[in-house]
């Protein structure tokens, strides 16, 4: 390999940090927000809706930033995303700190929080595709897959570190706002280092950035079982106009219909589970009257779930060589099993085991569904299929978490019945609609 055909380790570490900090910060926030909402006296559903607004903006803006990352200015796009994360996290932390100290009422606090959070939804999605494109444009074919896999793994690792660090960052004086302050500082340090140490764009190879979902869990942005089913990324046409050489790929396409339906059902099951788990722990552990004590338990459960997800993606799928249909089927089957201890467990151990089983299932399901949709269409349609899959993944986090929390608040059984029904529905789809063999790499469109 030519000496210039790879990224120096220090630059790779910086790009890794860009992705790691945003993923860890978001999942750390998830660990403390149920407790903060309880302190503020806000209905649980409004806390979930504050996330939903940001998720909607992310889904709408991510394709735009991904297109921008295809051009020069990737360093600027990374800086924009990190600056948005740092500013949004700082404003969210200040708003919640003021609300907890009586400066604002509960309703005003959560509305201002949602507005501050929208900055991340609008601009935060600029970083991931820019990082991907930067790496792809500076690495040769031999190193590219490994480098992109390392970048993608930083998101997953961040979802483990965030919940693990959150309880340790709850310090005197700041309390539950500690994680917001800490990750704002981390983001600023990464941003300054990025501006000073990362060279401006001078790409040696063509490189593209992908639309990525917001990092709500370790399986938000799964790696494909087979990253390039039609060959190496260098064999794909460069800068091909959207929909060139064929009709626009539709959601109703018979080749995609079953995969997308399974993706919608499984994605909504996962988002409901993630939306409810923090409030479930507050109730089952009897911590509504001392919510500060719940942050550690919530962080532990989320961390165990993230580890289980990464075990599936980094260990089980490659070791067992599971195909898309098998990954999807087994993943949703494990979700059906794990929902039972979640719905019935009364102690931290049982709830953690149930959540880990479900997360293991989602770790199998997400890559299976994603690669199944990719392999179902031809080479020239890969970009369109990836966009549709990204939309399916993102749409699950817009209203489903809030609906799940609303159902849970009306009856502690309703949310779990819905999750179980969605998972069973996905299993039925796998059995009935995914019997046709997927195309092989030799069957190019």
Each language-model region and where it sits:
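Juxtamembrane intracellular "pre-TM" segments in multi-pass secondary transporters
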Residues: 1-9, 199-261
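Helix-loop boundary and gating motifs at the non-cytosolic
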Residues: 5-55, 258-262, 267-288
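Hydrophobic core of transmembrane alpha-helices in multi-pass small-molecule transporters
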Residues: 20, 101-126, 350-364
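Helix-to-loop junctions at the C-terminal end of transmembrane segments
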Residues: 61-74, 309-324, 408
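Primarily marks hydrophobic transmembrane alpha-helices of the MFS/SLC 12-helix fold
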Residues: 78, 328-329
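C-terminal ends and interior cores of transmembrane alpha-helices
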Residues: 83-106, 334-346
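Cytoplasmic helix-loop-helix junction between adjacent transmembrane helices
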Residues: 116-155
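Symmetry-related core transmembrane helices of the 12-TM Major Facilitator Superfamily/SLC fold
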Residues: 177-195, 415-432
